[in-house]
Amino acid sequence: MTHAFDMALPATLTHAQATAVAQQLQKTLLSAKETCVLDASALQQFDSSALAVLLGACRTAAQQKLRLQIIGLPKRAMQLAMLYGVSEILAGHSSLPPSP
């Protein structure tokens, strides 16, 4: 039986919200069993702190041997990830293809 823990990012995820969101995601991931789905579709206002939160979630999932799927990641967030050179990491967890 697969246990999916659905999580959602807020509409705004900047430096001001990053610590609280990261702590909540980590808490949820640490209590998960197999698969976690992270819905990023509400994300509208964000900065590089959002990438740090997402990368932290990917790292925690890997450490816990969980499958993390990021859905609804806005195109602008993936473009920012490409700018910082981390798009391949996020693409491995999202429904978006990796950069060419």
What positions do the PLM features span?
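STAS-like cytosolic regulatory interaction modules
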Residues: 1-46, 56-100
